[in-house]
Amino acid sequence: MTSSDGSDLTTLVNVGRSVARYFERIGITEIAQLRDRDPVELYERMSAAFGQRLDPCLLDTVMSAVDQAEGLPARPWWHYTPERKRLLAGEGHDRAGGTAGEGTA
């Protein structure tokens, strides 16, 4: 899956071969396929594909990958942990307008 055109998922910060395999399992093989996608929906599809609820930290990485695919700056996966916890607690968020709480401490 090596590519010189920037489509290789492993060129994204936080996405190594292991995480790329989770994406591949649900048919995501290129960065462009992450644009305008709901990270929670992707994570839930990954969990369903593997027949178990996957580590919630994977959702942090999926959120990071989607943001990068949409042109936002690369951030470490743990930057997304507070938002992920809100999402999984049902507090919601706004992907179209950026991450909830963006720019707050």
Curated annotation (Swiss-Prot):
GO terms for biological process: response to antibiotic. The keyword Cell membrane does not apply. Keywords: Antibiotic resistance. The gene is mcrB. It comes from the Bacteria. Transmembrane segments: none annotated. Involved in mitomycin resistance. May operate with McrA or may be a type of transcriptional activator protein. This is Mitomycin resistance protein McrB.
